[in-house]
Amino acid sequence: MSPFELEFEGLKVQIGSIEGFEPRGEGPLPCPTVSDLADWDRKLFARYRVIAFPICDMCCMCTYGRCNLAEGRRGACGIDIRSNTARFTALKTCIGAACHAAHARHLVEYILEKLGDVEIDLGSEVDVMTPIFETLVGFKPKTVSDLEKGLEYIERELTKVLSSVHVGQEMDPHDYESKALHAGMIDNLALEIADVAQIAAFDMPKGEAPLVEFGPFAADDSKPCILLVGHNVAPGTEVLDYLEERGLDEEVEVLGICCTAWDVSRVDDRSKVIGPLSRQLHYVRMGIADVVVLDEQCIRADIVEEANEVGSRVIATRDLVMAGLPDVTDEPTEKIIEKMVSGEWMGVFIEDLEKAAEVAVEVAIRVHERRKKEIPQPDPKKLQKEAKRCLGCGDCERVCPNDLPIVEAMERAANGDFEGLADLFDRCVGCARCESECPTKLRVMNMIEDAWRLRTKEEKYKVRTGRGPIKDVEIRQVGGPIVMGDIPGVVAFVACPNYPDDVKQVGKMVEELLERNYIVLTSGCTAMALGMYTDEDGKTLYEKYEDRFDAGCLVNTGSCVSNAHILGACIKIAAIFAKKPLKGNFKEIADYILNRIGACGVLWGTMSQKALAISTGFTRWGIPIVYGPAGLKYQTLYIGDLDGDWTVYDARTGKECKEYCPIHLKYAAEDWREALVQAVKLCIRPNDTPQGRQTKLQNYIELYKEFYNELPPDLPLYVRDKNDVPITLRDEVMEYLEEVGWKPRKGITEPTLLEENVRG
């Protein structure tokens, strides 16, 4: 029952809103606009140079064009290439933010309609439940309907930023980047609204989570299988509800690819997480699914065609992804089921989620036995025969984003050796461009997958499903050690599986950091990639390391929207440990994170506009980002400029000094070793105590020497005096520092970029 709905015998009274009960933003700056935070952005750009990497020199945005902007030229509207590149950064960030905003809007409205105005409760150990919302919107939401205030703010600001990319609007590259930061920041708010709403409504884990089975062979293919693909858990919850109502919980397998997989496993841990986005085409072609249910985001544009080819029926459920399918929402349920079972309708769009769930379950049950007999299994003879059709032209390798040695693998397969093809599976990003280029139309991905299946037989792992928020008690225990530097850092491995090489490289980085006592958080497709990394005993990192927000522990927060809890943990350190007020207080909180909390994000396989929005938002809050090499295609990085303004004030005394950390805000690494070194370095903060700085520098120096066989050349930037130098490395480091003319300097106790924070 709604809190504004009264029911008596024979009478129901509904009250829309009560005068005086409307929550209002409080604090210095509730619901800040672009211009409200432009001065904070300028402080960032005064030290971090915006480096542009335009993908194309041409601008085709209006009918004046196309205009060549190369070599200092300007377009017909007057724009230059730097501003145009920044404009596209803002545009792509808006696209990503719009995805999460639409997702959050749908979840909130769906929950209000289906369950009423649910109270927001993230468990007894989480009191600061919505740190991003409180910091930006200015009040603490109590029920799901309160979250609509945040959505209104998001939609208002997103519309403004998007309008700025129109011809004849913004013209300055830094102001475009400022707008990109704004869109990213409100994207982070959308993440929190979506995840908090679904945790409250669907009783997801609240700070702890079980281990679940992971991988395509975790599915019991002797049962009817429903495969959920996308990011919005609402259709999946309806499937689970229908199965429970019918008593079919144990009779039908519910599987998931991408973030829907994490979220449905958070609702019911009997569901199976089978793989990330990069495996979507592979696993659809395997024919595991009797029915594929689509919701939204990260869905391949050819999924309907690919699913139908192996006899899987497809049901689209969101108007964001109608997929050209007939809208049968208003058709009788039994008619839809009959036509899908017969194959007359191989794919349909059903916007009514309850009906979609019923159809999915009933169709899966009825087609399963027939489909099971039709699914082809890997055949070594057929695989060898296909490999012999390869011309060795190399067209596939030229378009492969990872330059995989496909031709060599085909030659080996033609001679009956399939190991080369099988080895490509973990390095394949699943784009299938090789197949589009092949003059003989070889199904290259199928061949790679078949070779892998012949070798693997059965691949099952254990992963920890998403646990959602970080508990307040965890923040109290580690807030001090993080701020002082005794815990060397908090590193988040997030985003897409567009890895530049073997998927297991992510696991190598994470394990190295865990062994060095960093707190590691993960989410989304990267959290799945970690599940594929095992030790010699076959154990995954989730089985080896504890699920706690503490030194040397590994936390999976959940799906992409759960990234809000990663940022939220940093905000909660400011609120719980430092007693900073949150409401409407973005600048002070971001300043605290930038100067005192050693946190960093690694997006090793970044691909989507959503990942750009998430990461760009994090940088505005003061959390630096390391991309993989694909991050260059986002077109702008924020690289430290040693000639910039690195002035930091001591809030106690007003004393000024230069502190060159974190040295970058957005960085792209060429290989995993460079990414690991940068992640460690970007956890260095002005607030580090001598002991904390020693710990951080020891990790930085040891890794740099291991990979590059020399001391880091930028050590003088981070050594304030000899007490910062690790004892075991002191002689070597001090000798080097003296050679390069380093001079000791004093640190400060309360670093801030904000002059208004100075008390002395």
Swiss-Prot record:
InterPro entries: 4Fe4S_Fe-S-bd, 4Fe4S_Fe_S_CS, CdhA, CO_DH_a-bundle, HCP/CODH, Prismane-like_a/b-sand, Prismane-like_sf. Keywords: 4Fe-4S, Iron, Iron-sulfur, Metal-binding, Nickel, Oxidoreductase, Repeat. [4Fe-4S] cluster 2 binds at residues 59, 62, 67, 77. [4Fe-4S] cluster 1 binds at residues 56, 60. Part of the ACDS complex that catalyzes the reversible cleavage of acetyl-CoA, allowing autotrophic growth from CO(2). The alpha-epsilon subcomponent functions as a carbon monoxide dehydrogenase. [Ni-4Fe-4S] cluster binds at residues 231, 259, 298, 496, 525, 560. It comes from the Archaea. [4Fe-4S] cluster 4 binds at residues 400, 428, 431, 434. It catalyses: CO + 2 oxidized [2Fe-2S]-[ferredoxin] + H2O = 2 reduced [2Fe-2S]-[ferredoxin] + CO2 + 2 H(+). Transmembrane segments: none annotated. Its cofactor is [4Fe-4S] cluster; [Ni-4Fe-4S] cluster. It comes from Methanopyrus kandleri (strain AV19 / DSM 6324 / JCM 9639 / NBRC 100938). Heterotetramer of two alpha and two epsilon subunits. The ACDS complex is made up of alpha, epsilon, beta, gamma and delta subunits with a probable stoichiometry of (alpha(2)epsilon(2))(4)-beta(8)-(gamma(1)delta(1))(8). The lineage of its organism: Archaea, Methanobacteriati, Methanobacteriota, Methanomada group, Methanopyri. Its EC number is 1.2.7.4. Residues 381-410, 418-450 form the 4Fe-4S ferredoxin-type domain. [4Fe-4S] cluster 3 binds at residues 390, 393, 396, 438. CO binds at residue 100. Belongs to the Ni-containing carbon monoxide dehydrogenase family. The keyword Cytoplasm does not apply. GO terms for biological process: acetyl-CoA metabolic process; generation of precursor metabolites and energy; response to hydrogen peroxide. GO terms for molecular function: 4 iron, 4 sulfur cluster binding; anaerobic carbon-monoxide dehydrogenase activity; hydroxylamine reductase activity; iron ion binding; nickel cation binding; peroxidase activity. Cluster B is an all-cysteinyl-liganded 4Fe-4S cluster; cluster C is a mixed Ni-Fe-S cluster which is the active site of CO oxidation. Cluster D is also an all-cysteinyl-liganded 4Fe-4S cluster that bridges the two subunits of the CODH dimer. Contains two additional 4Fe-4S clusters, dubbed E and F, that probably transport electrons from ferredoxin to the B cluster. This is Acetyl-CoA decarbonylase/synthase complex subunit alpha 1. Binds 7 [4Fe-4S] clusters per heterotetramer. Binds 2 [Ni-4Fe-4S] clusters per heterotetramer. It holds the Pfam family Fer4_9.
